[in-house]
Amino acid sequence: MNFYSMPTRRGAQTFFAKSSKEGETFAKALQSALNAEINSKEGGRQYSALCAEKYILECSPYPSAIVECGFLSNYADEINLQKTEYQMRLASVLCGVCKRVLKRRCR
């Protein structure tokens, strides 16, 4: 979850390490699915995956992404993030992308 100074900002956002092309591809796949299944439907917005200098991303030997599932500074996101149904939708989207990525890597 994220907090932003403008309470109108809402939705799920992904981040990747600048040094990882595979991580960037993974984050973009996650973001695309989140845009289609969550962001467009809940807030009418779409976002791009962003490059971030975060320790957990830089030090991972595997393609990695951070997913922020919503903004606590946005009331609608705060309410949604507390609902089991919304959490399950998020989990389903993320799991679906992970399964597709792993399936491609195992070929």
Name each model feature, range by range.
Residues 1-107:
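Active-site-proximal helix/loop segments of hydrolytic enzymes
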